[in-house]
Amino acid sequence: MWNKNRLTQMLSIEYPIIQAGMAGSTTPKLVASVSNSGGLGTIGAGYFNTQQLEDEIDYVRQLTSNSFGVNVFVPSQQSYTSSQIENMNAWLKPYRRALHLEEPVVKIIEEQQFKCHIDTIIKKQVPVCCFTFGIPNESIIERLKEANIKLIGTATSVDEAIANEKAGMDAIVAQGSEAGGHRGSFLKPKNQLPMVGTISLVPQIVDVVSIPVIAAGGIMDGRGVLASIVLGAEGVQMGTAFLTSQDSNASELLRDAIINSKETDTVVTKAFSGKLARGINNRFIEEMSQYEGDIPDYPIQNELTSSIRKAAANIGDKELTHMWSGQSPRLATTHPANTIMSNIINQINQIMQYK
């Protein structure tokens, strides 16, 4: 059976389908619907404070008794100078003026927020913890394992996958370059961050690690799930497929933009957050490409552009806000999450029937 393997057993799920923990875009209804449909729903906790995360976990538990996960951002070493911030603020001033915004005060609370997230996950006995942007330190991994929490890391290269396994992850998401949103890269090669496609990345990781591999990037339906399994993955993680669901927290602006876009419309940019992320190209990205200075690293740039993005989204201006999307938007739907899950499963079963 395609849906019975080490991953489904480890995560206590019926189908090896994980809804990506998209920070700012998941809702308790989305998470619970995926879990109730036999997959693993995941709370995107990246931007939550402690109380918000506790409330989200409690709400999900009211809606499902099945397994679910929480995705957290691993803090990275920030490299920035005051002149970088000053220069970026000067560049962003016309956007703020047009939207009647003040210059923000940058607060770096990443490390503290991450520690609180880990404490909350342990306190609330969340079944699964997923990591993006790196690997937590040994003591955090030990604490989570002592609490019997399953750990899923993210890799965009073979070296990152090996590092995840050595650190003690129970499974690895192999994030191909087709994936929407932020790249999960954390080992920086000499030239640039890895941009390896899913079909190339998955089998190369499968061949060098002994733990289950979860394919991610461009997977939207049953065909993508089965293709991933053929490549050696034991499951898939899907983001954009659930982002456009009516159960997600995506704005109508973003939902419509994805549904009406095509595979050539996305680019990978640091313009909005200081980390490479794939989204639909727009005026802000185009104009930021002309910026001659160094874009401050995440989370600095994310803080500097936050009010601009929110204000633009509030007035329906898709040219000045981030529109994260993977490279398969033509396959996106606005169905409820449980319908998306049942359609995927039915399509897989139909394909298997004819093979």
From Swiss-Prot:
Reaction catalysis annotation: 3 propionate 3-nitronate + 3 O2 + H2O = 3 3-oxopropanoate + 2 nitrate + nitrite + H2O2 + 3 H(+)
GO-annotated molecular function: nitronate monooxygenase activity; nucleotide binding
EC number: 1.13.12.-
UniProt cross-references to Pfam families, sorted A to Z: NMO (PF03060)
Highest taxon in the source lineage: Bacteria
Cofactor note: Binds 1 FMN per subunit.
GO biological process, one term: response to toxic substance
CDD domains according to UniProt: NPD_like
Binding site for FMN: 71, 175, 180, 218, 237-240
Role played: Nitronate monooxygenase that uses molecular oxygen to catalyze the oxidative denitrification of alkyl nitronates. Acts on propionate 3-nitronate (P3N), the presumed physiological substrate. Probably functions in the detoxification of P3N, a metabolic poison produced by plants and fungi as a defense mechanism.
Miscellaneous information on this protein: P3N is a potent irreversible inhibitor of the key enzyme succinate dehydrogenase in the Krebs cycle and electron transport chain. P3N has been shown to be a toxic metabolite to bacteria, plants, fungi, mammals or any organism that uses succinate dehydrogenase.
Protein family according to the UniProt entry: Belongs to the nitronate monooxygenase family. NMO class I subfamily.
Protein name according to UniProt: Probable nitronate monooxygenase
Organism encoding this protein: Staphylococcus aureus (strain JH9)
Lineage: Bacteria, Bacillati, Bacillota, Bacilli, Bacillales
